[in-house]
A protein has these predicted regions:
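Nucleic-acid modification enzymes, centered on SAM-dependent nucleic-acid methyltransferases
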Residues: 1-232
Length: 232
């Protein structure tokens, strides 16, 4: 049953994890990096955390960094978040969430791995996914009361489906809809915990993207999120 379900879901959802290589060939996304977006307190312009606060060569997140627009020296605590407002069809209401944008894609073409900055075609694909209704049912419950379970209320992540990107939520919903056996449903639950916005994008052993994972015992949402391709 597992192979049959996987084949069906891949056939229906594989398009969500495609990207264009430099020569126009289609690559399969391994993971996408999402970054927090903040507002400079001096010039009031948006800055993307990955671009402004990360030394890619040294593999470090800087404590202090210049605003890319006005050169004011900033740190995380000095900045306000940028926000997005959208209609959440699962809740039938408008929600406000801290803004995160895709900045980097790791993908494969003919079993060779590459990295690229997110381009217009990638953004268009994400916009298409975000503006399309997920055809299957998925859980959308409010997180229960508790210090940890409600820690993300201030950034607008209040219900279980908010912890997933739209495409991974879509694939999960598809898997659940097609899966009949309890054993497979338990397996899907295990996978579901590894593809949330809790997954940190980190630098380890000289490589960005190595290590990472959720911060143990917490529902901490990092400023740099590694969105894994659930179909991988």
């Amino acid at each position: 049953e597992a192979k049959k379900v996987l084949t069906e879901v891949e056939k229906e959802c594989d398009w969500m994890f495609e990207t264009k290589h430099t020569d126009g060939r289609t690559g399969k996304i391994n993971y996408t990096v999402w970054s927090d977006v903040f507002i400079c307190p001096e010039c009031s312009k948006e800055l993307i955390f990955w671009e402004a606060a990360v030394d890619k060569e040294a593999g470090q997140v800087l404590d202090e960094f210049p605003c890319p627009h006005c050169n004011t020296i900033l740190n995380k605590s000095r900045m306000e978040r940028s926000w997005v407002t959208f209609f959440d069809s699962a809740l039938s209401e408008t929600v406000r969430q801290a803004k995160q944008v895709p900045v980097l894609i790791n993908y494969s073409v003919n079993n060779h791995r590459f990295e690229k900055k997110v381009d217009k075609s990638d953004l268009d694909l994400i916009n298409t996914i975000d503006s399309t209704q997920i055809p299957q049912w998925f859980p959308s419950s409010r997180l229960m009361n508790g210090k940890e379970t409600r820690r993300n209320d201030p950034i607008g992540l209040t219900h279980v489906h908010h912890f997933y990107t739209k495409r991974n939520l879509w694939v999960l919903a598809n898997f659940l809809n097609k899966t009949k056996s309890l054993k497979l449903k338990i397996l899907i639950t295990k996978v579901a915990m590894q593809i949330t916005k809790l997954y940190r994008f980190t630098y380890q052993s000289g490589t960005w993207g190595a290590g990472g994972g959720p911060l143990s015992g917490t529902l901490y949402i990092p400023s740099l999120v590694k969105e894994l391709n659930i179909l991988k």
